[in-house]
């Protein structure tokens, strides 16, 4: 309410503010539609009875960032909220800051006076939430061991029998360090190998049967000092920064006191340059670079880890190579991945390889790149994720080697593109190593050969021996890895499907709950009915009889599914609460927000505070007259100025509608829950509330909502339906939602569009309601199968509809069951989320069978997952162990959040949204689940920008800790700059803070910040200028071994076997890595293993069994087993590397060998046999036997401009296969990769467009494209290749195309209308489904588009190749056929052409011409040396292609080709910077061009020639143009201090020093207090000297009060003498200006001065003056303009505000002073008022008021040359032509 009042007061001022940019308006439109869609979801349709259950959710893009998103959760994932202490339970209300920062209570005072009455008995503190999966070393927590049964004596049993020291070695990865002085074949390894090698470590250990001796000698160390390298066994993990006990076991060759030195780059000016003497020559013909990195979340774009860059040209170029992180193509600040770019000196554009998936922040990753002179490849964790053949030859000539530098942490540009994160090792080779080197070195025997190619192993201790800071920057932080290493990931975590929310949606996991009945064992669940009575305990909301009947119905429905309910009733005695109407989804902030909110349209809210309807006219004399007038009781009249909320005047229970009043008659469900503070940790709480629509029966909280087990969770039911006969199934339905069940009609009636990926057409566990035993069905209240329906998505029948299911909308007399899949989901969620609702204290089950991870003849090693709830400690009541990881790290989400920013009137995006775990479903899209500083004014399309100091959000954590990392989820932002956070302030416990400055962030990867601060961290404050930023959550992670985790006891595990172990007892495993090696095994014997968890003396259910025959193959053994149906086996159980954890090929990958080597094959430029039919990118369109494919040879369009949108681009093969969503700059991007319609929309205003339906076209703007084909035939398919699908982000109407085929007689045949989507590119239309077209011979295709934003790159036609039918169709009579819009595809007359004409090609060899049938012939064409193919029609020929196969059919060759001389074209300027090229001989094959430098650049090198080579590229340059400066110019009034500066040929960066002569100083220091005498000028990158001069000393002018009282001999210059005129007999001594720029004495007023100035004239020139000091001499008056908003300025005598020209720039007057002559200075006659500038300069809109010099010409918004979009958008609709023109005299238009 306070927000709204402030906005109303400010409305007149804000109304003058301009909008943000055009894209800003689009952003708000999307956000506003989100709010309206949320309203729509919450305002229920007719017959709706369930609120939250009906809410449509979009598929989540990043489930790993959400609560319960993966199982088991990674160390980098985030914990669930733990309950607050008991002191929090007593609070009856929460407070939020108002705009002044004061707390405003949300709960009325009379509710806070009696907290006991609200709560009844205070429940016990909730048991803690469970923690993460066990992934760290648990040395902190106790024995890391295994033993038999419950005995404490250790008995030898395989790995379990190893003594403690050895056991640790057997369950952790060992770091080994050695030298390469005497290399051995089995020890030659570089970098760290892929994690799959861990499997071999285990196999070897099992064979040896003992500790350290079992470590394979094949594994090599990490680089240490010179020429040392290490195999990947596992990624490193840093110890705490204070050097505490770590997590590495050191081998005998490793000094544990030293550790492994690594670098941490903070992302701020920490680039390192390799010293030239370290590496004689950087490899240029072939190389391999390997690096272990641990990147932070949030990076520069791009962020360079390492690279080789040009150090001679001083211009930004792609020459060299770079390895780093960047956003995916056309993705903005999202989808960041590892990349490898490379550009030889022969080409002008780099080739960029991008990884197949996002990088993982905070995870050690092995990244490698190779180049062999032809093939470049990128490897991530040993998998080849991208490759290319686009570059060839050496990187540079030998002469240019001196111009290349190796950098770490950034590139050589001014921006730096700094990397942020850890760099562990860097290894450099002079050869391109094979993929096996990165994965399976133990099988690789070329170690000695490779060692000779090793040229650099980076050493970081001491770092300055090999590296030096680049450009005077600083060294990165040096850290040391010590101690034991956390166990690496063995199994990829289970994740939900695309349409899922949690791991209970994972098909593999939920199938176990379906098939293994012990997981669905008996569960007794507690629930609590919250029954509110009056103060005397009378008049409860629901009766005891209602409660009894409902309880019986609940148990009757669930008990047959092993779920029973335990009832408790919580009575609240509070008359105030009892007499208030509680409304679902109607927050007080919505009342009177100038927008009718249907959910608040209730009589007791005054019909939304008058927003929905007014009761009549309110007369002013009725307000505040001691009576409540219904017509005045609204927000517009301030609710009768308080009369209607005065208990002395009216019955406030019926008349008080003011949302700010503590007496109001209504409250929201959220306020009720806030007042009661009933935590949902131990109970499912049942509340009662009404709704505006009486048919709302209930609302529930999803189990994945972050409020599910807080005081804001539970179920809200209508008391009118609760426990009433015929309505008891309503609560059963809502409980189903709480336990994770969707409506059975989800995916049919609940879907976003016809293309919704979660649409359900057949029963499925991955779409719809995620249950395969509930058939798709529409929403219906009829107790029968629904009738077939026909809607916009087509005609659909619904056989087997589950209308009797509790999750349908049928009545109680019809619903009677849950399906087995639904029962499995409910049991899963009870274990995953609600385990503390049960009486049982036993651990939750392990729902996945154990898995085999190692096997020898004598042993078998198994691994298992933790309990599904993630329990890693005993659940001690009241402890914080649920927030601890196994290394003693304590992690916590935000506890309280606040912002001084005024809240949006919609009630969304409040600071509270940033409390708790992240819950935004779709990162990078606007969401209602995040905080945003956006304030929108309804009806004005205006958002209020952040103030000059920025918008801020303060986030506080409950427990201050010694912090290690801060994680921040910034899920959406609008600013183009990545640094949307211009400052991040870390708040410390001692009230101090540390400012980190700006940080780069992505919207789909959380921002992680490594904290190096002293003291305990208590919170963080972030600052931004982006008013549309959205922040979802923040997580604070402590350093290991936190005192808050010191008392936590880990869970133990019991391993059961059938047949039993020799002792007859289960094996108890206490170590945290959940592994066990069984050495009591016999080959060929079948064994069954089960694991159960033990905690607090209780045993959980045994896991589903693993059945394995010892010696049999298994997934992960590195051998592809056909018997198991394996498609690959790379030796691990990790997905995302090409071979999934179930040994299936992943999409886009191919795997070869054993263990499998996997690589991405799509787009690598190589057409392999297995992809010939499927890969259009590598192999082109596959033409089946019996068909012919042809590309369009001619094209016509409705809108064509041969320069802007040439339609010829759609002929031939597509120039690009990349399809993207539409953005306005796409049609202007060069080079064009496709045709875009030239629809004249530039002059169309925003209002014009808003009146049209989304994506629609006006009649005159209809877009059509007609393409013609040379060879008419019977059409079988049409292929349409898209450049863009025309879909604008935020819009949902899919663009379409309607197709017509035109036959040889000119008749059109419709093929229907099809949606366009980049997900289906090319769009393939199967013509065989259209019988009316099959036997017509198609000559052209007409395409009509629904949107002008579509881009087409090519169209292809597939026809039947049957000769008998196609031969007569090759021609058409001249007088036949119709054309479209006057454009004809008729291209030749009829005539008999049965024989193939001879191929007579110059400069070509015709070889192997063979006849393949009557009228059919094939010829292979090869051009001579120095010639290349060129096509005049037909398919697109690759540049410099020399061979082609031509086919002749019915006398017609399929292509017209010729062999033309290779022409390299004029050399691109990027080949040699600052050079001119002279090509007097031409630019064809073997011709030469000379190189000359553009002054002042000087030629370096002896061979200034380029030669055109056979591949169409120029030879490598062997010279460069070095920018040098001549001798610097003479500096007047200065003496040169460095004599060598008088010479010529100064390198860029050279500094010359001068000393200014006495009485002069450096011009740049004129504004500073200290006047510098020493002048430095630098040779700049343009080959010119920096400007510099020495200027005379000038003293400060005397204060204005002395104006007109002094006379000076030479102004205020050096040695000038000034005399004050005081009219005294005694003459005053002169005051001198000294060479220091100071007066010899202070100017003082004459002693005899008296009197005062006359009062300034009132309102002269519309200015009035405020004279608080009076009018005496020296008094100051402040000018104020009578008409705001205006500024007082000083104008010349002959100029007024009306005659002021736009190019004049007057000076603003801050004050006037009464001088000693009793006159005002400046003269008030010269002070005028002109209109103030609006605070929207440089916002993308041309504001006419700002288009003048005084306002800096609106920051460039009114000139196309100064706009990034190059398009001026006038803000005012009636903008005068002159006002909106480009007036800036400095703009290009006015030069």
Curated annotation (Swiss-Prot):
Composition bias of kind Basic and acidic residues appears in: 89-99
According to the lineage, what is the superkingdom?
Answer: Eukaryota
Compartments where found: Secreted
Q: Which cysteines are joined by disulfide bonds?
A: 312-403, 499-793, 504-828, 586-600, 596-612, 628-644, 645-656, 754-771, 758-783, 881-1045, 884-1048, 924-1003, 946-951, 1115-1143, 1128-1139, 1151-1158, 1167-1179, 1205-1238, 1219-1318, 1371-1385, 1396-1448, 1423-1459, 1464-1508, 1479-1489, 1493-1521, 1525-1579, 1541-1552, 1556-1590, 1595-1633, 1608-1618, 1622-1646, 1653-1714, 1667-1677, 1681-1729, 1733-1751
Q: Which residues form the signal peptide?
A: 1-22
Which residue windows does the record flag with biased composition (Basic residues)? 191-203
Domain Sushi per the UniProt entry, residue ranges = 1393-1461, 1462-1521, 1523-1592, 1593-1648, 1651-1731
Q: Does the keyword Protease apply?
A: yes
Kindly give the PROSITE patterns that the UniProt entry links to this protein: SUSHI (PS50923), ZINC_PROTEASE (PS00142)
User: Which residues of the precursor form the propeptide?
Assistant: 23-234
The UniProt note on the cofactor reads as follows: Binds 1 zinc ion per subunit.
Matching Pfam families: Laminin_G_3, Peptidase_M43, Sushi
Q: What class of enzyme is it?
A: hydrolase
What are the alphabetically sorted keywords of the record?
A: Disease variant, Disulfide bond, Dwarfism, Glycoprotein, Hydrolase, Metal-binding, Metalloprotease, Protease, Repeat, Secreted, Signal, Sushi, Zinc, Zymogen
NCBIfam families linked: myxo_disulf_rpt
Recorded hits in PANTHER family, A to Z, give: LAMGL DOMAIN-CONTAINING PROTEIN, PAPPALYSIN-2
Sum up the protein's function in the record's words. Answer: Metalloproteinase which specifically cleaves insulin-like growth factor binding protein (IGFBP)-5 at the '163-Ser-|-Lys-164' bond. Shows limited proteolysis toward IGFBP-3.
Per its UniProt record, which disorder involves this protein?
Short stature, Dauber-Argente type: An autosomal recessive disorder characterized by progressive postnatal growth failure, moderate microcephaly, thin long bones, mildly decreased bone density, and elevated serum levels of total IGF1, IGFBP3 and IGFBP5. Levels of circulating free IGF1 are reduced.
Q: How does it assemble?
A: Monomer.
Similarity remark? Belongs to the peptidase M43B family.
Recorded protein name is Pappalysin-2
Provide the species name: Homo sapiens (Human)
As recorded in Swiss-Prot or TrEMBL, the protein's gene is named: PAPPA2
């Amino acid at each position: 309410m306070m927000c709204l009042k402030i906005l109303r007061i400010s409305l007149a001022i804000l109304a003058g503010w301009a909008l943000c940019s055009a894209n800003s308006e689009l952003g708000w439109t999307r956000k506003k539609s989100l709010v309206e869609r949320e309203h729509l979801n919450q305002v229920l349709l007719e017959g709706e009875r369930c609120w939250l259950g009906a809410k449509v959710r979009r598929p989540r893009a990043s489930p790993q960032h959400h609560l319960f998103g993966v199982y088991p959760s990674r160390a980098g994932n985030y914990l669930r909220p733990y309950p607050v202490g008991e002191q929090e339970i007593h609070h009856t209300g929460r407070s939020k800051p108002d705009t002044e920062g004061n707390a405003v209570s949300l709960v009325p005072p009379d509710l806070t006076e009696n907290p006991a009455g609200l709560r009844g008995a205070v429940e016990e503190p909730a048991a803690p939430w469970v923690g993460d999966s066990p992934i760290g070393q648990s040395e902190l927590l106790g024995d890391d061991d295994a033993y038999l049964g419950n005995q404490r004596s250790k008995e030898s049993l395989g790995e379990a029998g190893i003594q403690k020291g050895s056991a640790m070695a057997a369950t952790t990865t060992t770091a080994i360090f050695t030298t390469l002085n005497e290399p051995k074949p089995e020890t030659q390894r570089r970098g760290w190998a892929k994690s799959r090698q861990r499997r071999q470590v285990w196999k070897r250990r099992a064979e040896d049967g003992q500790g350290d001796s079992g470590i394979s000698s094949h594994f090599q160390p990490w680089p240490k000092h010179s020429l040392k390298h290490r195999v990947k066994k596992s990624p490193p993990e840093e110890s705490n920064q204070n050097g505490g006990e770590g997590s590495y076991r050191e081998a005998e060759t490793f000094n544990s006191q030293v550790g492994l030195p690594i670098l941490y780059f903070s992302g701020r000016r920490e680039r390192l340059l390799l010293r030239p003497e370290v590496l004689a020559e950087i490899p240029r013909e072939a190389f391999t670079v390997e690096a272990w990195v641990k990147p932070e979340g949030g990076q520069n774009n791009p962020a360079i880890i390492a690279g080789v860059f040009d150090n001679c040209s001083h211009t930004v170029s792609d020459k060299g190579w770079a390895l780093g992180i960047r956003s995916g193509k056309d993705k903005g600040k999202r989808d960041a991945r590892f990349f490898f770019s490379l550009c030889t000196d022969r080409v002008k554009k780099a080739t960029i390889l991008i990884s197949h998936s996002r990088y993982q922040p905070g995870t050690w990753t092995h990244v490698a790149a190779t180049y062999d002179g032809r093939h470049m490849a990128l490897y991530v964790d040993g998998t080849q994720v991208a490759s290319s053949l686009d570059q060839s030859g050496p990187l540079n000539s030998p002469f240019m080697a001196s111009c290349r530098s190796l950098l770490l942490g950034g590139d050589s540009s001014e921006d730096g593109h700094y990397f942020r994160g850890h760099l562990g090792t860097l290894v450099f080779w002079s050869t391109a190593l094979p993929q096996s080197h990165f994965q399976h070195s133990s099988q690789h025997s070329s170690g000695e050969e490779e060692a000779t190619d090793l040229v650099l192993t980076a050493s970081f201790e001491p770092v300055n021996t090999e590296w030096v800071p680049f450009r005077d920057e600083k060294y990165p932080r040096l850290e040391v890895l010590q101690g034991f290493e956390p166990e690496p990931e063995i199994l990829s975590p289970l994740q939900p499907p695309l349409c899922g929310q949690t791991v209970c949606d994972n098909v593999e996991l939920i199938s176990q709950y379906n098939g293994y009945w012990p997981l669905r064992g008996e569960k007794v669940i507690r629930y609590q009915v919250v029954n509110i009575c009056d103060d005397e305990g009378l008049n409860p909301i629901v009766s005891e009889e209602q409660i009894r009947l409902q309880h019986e119905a609940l148990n009757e429905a669930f008990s047959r599914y092993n779920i029973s309910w335990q009832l408790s009733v919580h009575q609240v005695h509070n008359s105030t609460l009892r007499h208030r109407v509680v409304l679902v989804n109607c927050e007080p902030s919505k009342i009177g927000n100038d927008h009718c909110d249907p959910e608040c349209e209730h009589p007791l809210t005054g019909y939304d505070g008058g927003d929905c309807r007014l009761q009549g006219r309110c007369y002013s004399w009725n307000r505040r007259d001691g009576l409540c007038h219904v017509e005045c009781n609204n927000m517009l009249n301030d609710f009768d100025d308080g009369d209607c909320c005065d208990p002395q005047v009216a019955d406030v229970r019926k008349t008080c509608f003011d949302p700010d009043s503590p007496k109001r008659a209504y409250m929201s469900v959220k306020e009720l829950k806030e007042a009661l503070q009933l935590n949902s940790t131990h109970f499912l709480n049942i509340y009662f509330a009404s709704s505006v629509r009486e048919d709302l029966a209930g609302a529930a909280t999803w189990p994945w909502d972050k409020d599910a087990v807080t005081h804001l969770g539970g179920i809200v039911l209508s008391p009118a339906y609760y426990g009433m006969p015929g309505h008891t199934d309503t609560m059963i339905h809502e409980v189903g939602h709480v336990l994770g069940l969707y409506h059975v009609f989800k995916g049919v009636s609940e879907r976003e569009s016809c293309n919704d990926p979660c649409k359900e057409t057949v029963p499925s566990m991955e779409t719809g309601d995620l249950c395969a035993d509930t058939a798709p069905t529409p929403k219906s209240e009829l107790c029968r199968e629904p009738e077939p329906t026909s809607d916009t998505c087509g005609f659909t029948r619904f056989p087997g509809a589950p209308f009797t299911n509790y999750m349908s909308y049928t009545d109680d007399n019809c619903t009677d069951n849950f399906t087995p899949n639904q029962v499995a989901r409910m049991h899963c969620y009870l274990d995953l989320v609600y385990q503390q609702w049960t009486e049982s204290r036993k651990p939750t089950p392990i729902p996945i069978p154990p898995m085999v991870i190692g096997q020898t003849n004598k042993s078998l090693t198994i691994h298992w997952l933790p309990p599904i709830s993630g329990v890693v400690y005993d659940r001690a009541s009241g402890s914080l162990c649920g927030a601890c990881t196994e290394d003693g790290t304590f992690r916590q989400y935000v506890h309280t959040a606040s912002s001084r920013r005024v809240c949006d009137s919609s009630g969304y995006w409040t600071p509270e949204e940033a409390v708790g775990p992240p819950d935004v479903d779709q990162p990078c899209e606007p969401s209602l689940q995040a905080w945003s500083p956006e304030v929108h004014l309804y009806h004005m399309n205006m958002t209020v920008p952040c103030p000059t100091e920025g918008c801020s959000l303060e986030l506080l954590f409950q427990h201050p800790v010694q912090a290690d990392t801060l994680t921040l989820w910034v899920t959406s932002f609008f600013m183009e700059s990545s640094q949307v956070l211009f400052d991040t302030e870390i708040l410390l416990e001692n009230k101090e803070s540390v400012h980190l400055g700006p940080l780069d962030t992505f919207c789909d990867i959380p921002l992680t910040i490594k904290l190096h601060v002293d003291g305990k961290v208590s919170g963080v404050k972030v600052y931004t200028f982006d008013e549309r930023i959205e922040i979802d959550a923040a997580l604070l992670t402590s350093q290991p071994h936190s005192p808050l985790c010191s008392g936590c006891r880990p869970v133990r595990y019991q391993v059961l076997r059938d047949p039993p172990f020799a002792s007859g007892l289960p094996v108890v495993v206490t170590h945290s890595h959940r592994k066990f090696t069984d050495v009591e095994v016999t080959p060929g014997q079948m064994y069954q293993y089960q694991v159960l968890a033990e905690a607090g003396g209780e045993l959980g259910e045994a896991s589903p069994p693993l059945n394995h025959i010892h010696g049999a193959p298994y997934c992960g053994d590195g051998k592809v087993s056909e018997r198991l149906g394996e498609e690959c086996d790379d030796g691990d159980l990790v997905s995302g590397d090409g071979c999934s954890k179930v040994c299936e090929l992943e999409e886009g990958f191919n795997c070869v060998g054993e263990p499998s080597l996997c690589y991405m094959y799509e787009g690598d430029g190589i057409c392999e046999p297995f992809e010939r039919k499927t890969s259009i990118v590598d192999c082109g369109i596959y033409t089946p036997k019996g068909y012919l494919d042809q590309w369009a040879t001619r094209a016509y369009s409705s809108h064509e401009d041969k320069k802007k949108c040439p339609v010829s681009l759609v002929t031939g093969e597509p120039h690009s296969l990349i399809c993207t969503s539409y953005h306005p700059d796409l049609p202007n991007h060069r080079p064009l990769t496709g045709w875009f319609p030239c629809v004249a929309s530039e002059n169309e205003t925003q209002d014009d467009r808003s009146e049209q339906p989304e994506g629609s076209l006006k009649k005159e703007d209809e877009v059509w494209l007609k393409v013609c084909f040379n060879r008419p035939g019977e059409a079988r398919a049409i292929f349409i290749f898209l450049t863009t699908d025309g879909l604008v982000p935020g819009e949902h109407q899919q663009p379409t195309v309607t197709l017509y085929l035109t036959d040889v007689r000119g008749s059109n045949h419709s093929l229907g209308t099809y949606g366009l989507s980049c997900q289906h590119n090319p769009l393939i239309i199967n013509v065989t489904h259209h019988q009316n077209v099959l036997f017509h011979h198609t000559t052209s295709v007409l395409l009509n588009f629904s949107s002008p934003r579509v881009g087409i790159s090519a169209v292809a036609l597939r026809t039947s190749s049957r000769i008998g039918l196609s031969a007569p169709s090759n021609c058409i009579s001249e007088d036949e056929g119709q054309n479209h819009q006057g454009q004809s595809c008729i291209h030749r007359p009829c005539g008999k052409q049965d024989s193939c004409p001879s191929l007579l090609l110059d400069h070509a060899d015709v070889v192997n011409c063979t006849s393949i049938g009557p009228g059919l012939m094939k010829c292979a064409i090869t051009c001579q040396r120095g010639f290349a193919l060129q096509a005049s029609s037909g398919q697109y020929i690759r540049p410099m292609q020399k061979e082609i196969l031509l086919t002749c059919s019915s006398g017609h060759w399929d292509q017209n080709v010729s062999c033309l001389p290779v022409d390299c074209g004029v050399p691109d300027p990027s080949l040699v910077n600052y050079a001119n090229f002279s090509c007097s001989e031409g630019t064809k094959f073997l011709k030469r061009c000379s190189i000359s430098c553009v002054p002042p650049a000087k030629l370096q090198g002896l061979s200034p020639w380029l030669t055109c080579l056979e591949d169409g590229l120029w030879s490598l340059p062997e010279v460069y143009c070095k920018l040098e400066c001549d001798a610097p110019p003479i500096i007047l009034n200065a003496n040169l201090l460095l004599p060598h500066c008088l010479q010529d040929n100064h390198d860029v960066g050279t500094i010359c020093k001068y000393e200014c002569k006495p009485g002069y100083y450096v011009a740049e220091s004129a504004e500073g207090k200290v006047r510098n005498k020493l002048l430095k000028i630098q040779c700049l990158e343009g080959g010119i000297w920096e400007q510099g001069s020495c200027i005379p000393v000038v003293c400060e002018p005397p204060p204005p009060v002395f104006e007109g009282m002094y006379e000076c001999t030479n102004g205020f210059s050096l040695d000038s003498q000034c005399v004050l005129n005081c009219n005294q007999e005694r003459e005053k001594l002169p005051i001198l200006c000294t060479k220091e720029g100071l007066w010899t004495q202070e100017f003082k007023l004459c002693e005899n001065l008296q009197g005062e100035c006359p009062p300034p004239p009132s309102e002269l020139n519309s200015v009035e003056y405020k004279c608080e000091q009076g009018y005496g001499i020296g008094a100051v008056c402040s000018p104020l303009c009578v008409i705001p908003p205006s500024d007082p300025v000083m104008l010349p005598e002959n100029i007024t505000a009306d005659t002021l020209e736009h190019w004049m720039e007057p000076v603003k007057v801050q004050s006037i002073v009464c001088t000693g002559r009793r006159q005002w200075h400046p003269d008030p006659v010269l002070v005028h008022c002109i209109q103030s500038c609006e605070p929207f300069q440089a916002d993308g809109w041309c504001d006419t008021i700002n288009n003048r010099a005084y306002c800096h010409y609106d920051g460039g918004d009114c000139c196309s040359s100064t706009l990034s979009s190059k398009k001026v958008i006038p803000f005012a609709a009636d903008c005068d032509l002159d006002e909106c023109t480009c007036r800036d005299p400095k703009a290009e238009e006015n030069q």
